[in-house]
Amino acid sequence: MSAKKVFLSVVFLLVFAIVFSEEYALVLSGGGGKGAYQVGVWKALKEYGIAQKVSVISGTSAGGLNAALFACESLENAEKIWLNEVPSKLTKDQKLISQEGLSEILDSVPLENIKDSYAQVYVTAVRDRLKLLKFIDSKLNGSSIGRHAYYFELNNDSFDEIKSKLLATSAFPVICDSVFVDDGDGGHYYSDGGEESIGGDNIPIKPVIEGYPEIKNIIVVYLSDQKHVSRRISAKDYDKINIIEFFPSIDLDGDSAFESLLDGTANFSNSRIRLLIQKGYEDTVDYFMRRKLYPVSSYWFE
């Protein structure tokens, strides 16, 4: 081999090593049944070799549940849970959102495997006490987004501790009961971490920014299209951070809060879930194709 070919081979290997050593963080917003969209995004991220480089996952509500699933289950099992378990158990006893059904699903998931996960996993919840005062505070003093959010790391928790935090982050206000969490501060009741009207954080990027300054690529997956999303992360707010945003390319919310709840957040039908998984996959693949990126064989990551 000529010296030139040797040199080019070395350069290629160095570039390859740099590209594939990049770390990513994944931020998953909440949205109930719309969370199926994130499963499709994750599927595409695996095909393109990105999911294997995600070292932090931070989620709230449905995004928190997915954060845990992605860290302790295979993609195939996560997809099966959404398609086969969620439609029947989340609407158990004809409830809009069944906490009992979610509890049954979580009992079948190996949550204890999160401690062995490559990725650090965080979920967000809002302490339940004084909800009304928090709501009034937000109205009197302007935005309270994130002011009352608690960010829980799951990697060192037991099965029961993880389960309680997942039930808490997904405890939709009014519809669901708040959940007791042993939080190291005497224990408190918590509810949906994505409810920003009472100080929650539906785009929980904070644990990544504050805890992992070395991560320069952050993927944010929203569960509303750009027309309906109430808040989005701005790259200009974070110095030298590459913010990669994914929005559903279709309207998941409808034209009213009522439609958003019934047709979006509380829609757990198998057909809807299947559609959202496919749409999340297609939107993510489209993002990569427009940037002339292609799937990679990822067997060396497994």
Task: Locate predicted features.
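Bacterial N-terminal signal peptides that target proteins for export
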Residues: M1-L8
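Short, linear, compositionally biased motifs with a strong N-terminal bias
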Residues: F12-L13
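Patatin-like phospholipase
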Residues: F20-I57, A68-E302
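Gly/Ala-rich beta-loop-alpha elbow adjacent to hydrolase catalytic centers
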Residues: G59, G63
